Regions:
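Non-catalytic accessory segments flanking enzyme active sites
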Residues: 1-75, 97-100, 104-105, 149
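Structured core elements
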Residues: 9-10, 53, 61-66, 80-82, ...
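Glycine-rich His-Gly loop
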Residues: 13, 82-86, 164
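Flexible loop/turn segments at secondary-structure boundaries
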Residues: 16-19, 30, 40-41, 60-62, ...
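Acidic/polar loop patches that form or flank catalytic/metal-binding clefts of enzymes
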Residues: 30-32, 74-76, 154-156, 181-182
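Short substrate-entry loop that stabilizes the transition state in hydrolases
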Residues: 72-78, 82-121
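Active-site-proximal cap/loop segments of hydrolase catalytic domains
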Residues: 111-208
Length: 208
């Protein structure tokens, strides 16, 4: 941004487009300066996620998104539940290449911001401190119930995956339910004792 705070350049990503450089000037419409990815994207099958929100069993609203294979919403699809890491991170409005790849291969992909995610206030984020696998797990299972009821999903072909905290939750899920037909845990926490003192984020998540 400029020293007088009247001009700024930035990169912007949308759910269906990779990052491009934009320009903002005070009092003027924002302007896209680059089109680096137009040719590449024109050769790909990109699908836009649909936002949904459901009321959890404790009365709180939980945000989620679902993607379907391009131009294919009438038939039932196998689905993959994606769980983010952190858990102090959050899904939002952006293009996620692995989700697009799975959708292009015929899978529906759904993902939510359960308790423990950032962007919803400290109470939401800290709800899982010392209680991993409790309210967060309930949010994810209730999201799955909601998705299977509302969307054309083949409930006999639903998988789950995630990395880091998402990998921990994948492990937790397969240890507590048989509803998923496949699971892939990535860079996960599988042992809290060995994880203590060896994590790349230090010996504690945050200072209480």
């Amino acid at each position: 941004y400029s020293a007088d705070h009247t001009t700024a350049s930035y990169t912007q990503t949308t759910p269906t487009h990779l990052s491009e450089v934009h320009l903002w000037r005070e009092g003027r419409p924002e302007k896209q300066l680059t089109k680096f990815n137009n040719t590449r994207l024109s050769r790909l099958h990109i699908t836009a996620p649909e936002h949904f929100s459901f009321k959890a069993s404790d009365g709180m609203n939980v945000d989620g998104w679902i993607m379907f294979p391009p131009n294919s919403r009438k038939q039932k699809h196998p689905a993959i539940l994606q769980i983010h890491g952190g858990p102090r991170t959050a899904y939002g409005i952006g293009l996620v290449h692995e989700f697009q790849l799975l959708a292009a291969q015929g899978f529906a992909v759904y993902y939510i911001n359960p308790r423990g995610s950032s962007s919803y206030g400290e109470d939401w984020t800290c709800a899982v401190a010392g209680h991993y696998g409790e309210r967060d797990y309930a949010d994810i299972m209730e999201a799955t119930d909601y998705v299977l009821k509302k969307y054309p999903i083949d409930r006999k072909r639903v998988g789950v995956t995630g990395g880091s905290y998402g990998g921990f939750m994948t492990n937790w899920i397969v240890g507590h339910t048989n509803r998923f037909k496949a699971a892939c845990t990535q860079r996960c926490i599988s042992n809290w004792v060995s994880f203590f003192g060896t994590s790349d984020i230090g010996w504690r998540f945050s200072q209480e």
